[in-house]
Amino acid sequence: MEETKKTCLHGRHVALGALMSPFGGFDMPIQYKGIVEEHNAVRTACGVFDVSHMGEVLVSGQDATRFVNYIFSNDVEPAHPGQCLYGMMLNERGGVVDDLLVYKFNENRYLLVINASNIEKDENWIVERMNDINPDSAEGLPFRVDVELVSEVVAELAVQGPDAEKVVEEVLSIACSDLTFYTFKEIKIDGNDAVISRTGYTGEDGFEIYAAEEVIEALWDKLMESGRCMPCGLGCRDTLRFEVGLPLYGDELADDITPVEAALTMFVKLDKPQFMGRDAVSAQKAAGAPRKLVGLELTDRAIPRHGYEVLNEADETIGYVTTGYHSISTDKSVAMALVDSRYAANGTPLKVRIRKKTFPCTVVPKRFYKKSYKK
């Protein structure tokens, strides 16, 4: 059995009394003071997450733009240096290998940020794609790129919440007010290279900082000493992302779930040159997907968990819950679910089977709480 990994901040989490649990191959903090308190801190003030378990891959070389566009559903070519893009890597069937962020430094250099649970799979898949024939090559040659796997040497913090900008500038002494949503810049922190972006996974304004482990350790210590930023675990990271309808790989996304089914086709640019999964997604978009990801709101106070059955009014199973909570911000029992497309219209009455009892629910938009990003 493979040993659980630890981030550079592991000892600090333990010292703070965090509840630790395995996630994506790492021993990670689930909560410190409690999920509700940490969730509310991010919604109203500021919280910091150790997200050093995420994976990072550098792609460089003269074919870097074409290669990234070949493995990535969004279009990096028109993006300007300093821009981040969200999208997916797709298999030939249109299923999602992973969802990720791409940071464009220039036409010849990109950073790909991938999910912790998929690091090994993604790295192998990306390296395999290097040997594919470049569709633009008249000679039928593979891509001329270098792929550097840097997950082991890059650590990451996410500072999130309406007070994040003030905290980053005043506590960490990092100028960030110039960054707009989904942009980034390269900076120096005590002489060390770092990257800061105005991105996050909470539905609130915030920043993600990538740097060497010793730099991230020092930033964490400053934040803790300041008392202006609550340490937050992965428990509230999940409740926060869920409330604003952001997907989690393994729940709303998977190798056998397509962007059409997950309602993410706005991040699949079918008009760009050939890329992995394009034909399958194009065909499904034209024909219509058999399943669709929807929101559900329950009438009663109950918690629908991942995998629970969704039923129609005739008690026939028509889908399953991908994520469900009693929403902390809205005080409603809600869920995201993958259901038969015939039952996906807003307002459709359905049921969720929780243990041996069924609870009535209604299909609603899957964004249960309004995002508060700074544009």
Explain the meaning of each model-derived region.
Residues 80-96, 177-190:
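Conserved alpha/beta core surface patches that mediate binding of polyanionic ligands
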Residues 55, 59, 92, 97, ...:
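Short coil/turn segments at secondary-structure boundaries
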Residues 1-87, 95-97:
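Acidic, proline/glycine-enriched N-terminal capping motif
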Residues 1-24, 28-30, 105-375:
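Conserved, structured C-terminal
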Residues 35-44, 90-99, 141-143, 188-195, ...:
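Short amphipathic beta-strand starts and helix->beta connectors
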Residues 100-104:
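Conserved thiamine diphosphate
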